Design a protein with these regions (language model features):
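Compact soluble domain cores
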Residues: 1-64
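Short, compact, well-ordered microdomains
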Residues: 54-92
Length: 92
């Protein structure tokens, strides 16, 4: 399965952390690859099913959660798949 992410953007918090830590940048990149492969990471089972449905239908929000070394990031694609944001949960 593949889907359209639209424009990929990140919050200032994510951009700041990438600039400060090469390891964090690698984590974001690896998570993006997982997201594009429809590997929803640490997302709950119900949201994984909703994500799969959104991919099949070509519309609907998609949200995935990835965790590493005590850090959590989200990837959120808007309902119309026009853009995807990488963010920290507290930035939502």
């Amino acid at each position: 399965m593949r889907f359209t992410t639209g424009r990929l953007v990140m919050t200032r918090g994510i951009a700041h952390e990438i600039a400060a830590s090469e390891d964090f940048g690698i984590f974001v990149t690896e998570s993006l690859h997982r997201y594009l492969d429809c590997d929803w990471g640490d997302t709950c089972t119900e949201d994984k099913a909703l994500n799969d449905e959104s991919v099949i239908n070509g519309e609907g929000d998609i949200l995935a959660v990835y965790k590493k070394d005590g850090r959590t990031i989200w990837f959120k694609t808007e309902w119309d798949h026009s853009y995807t944001t990488v963010l920290f949960p507290e930035e939502y």
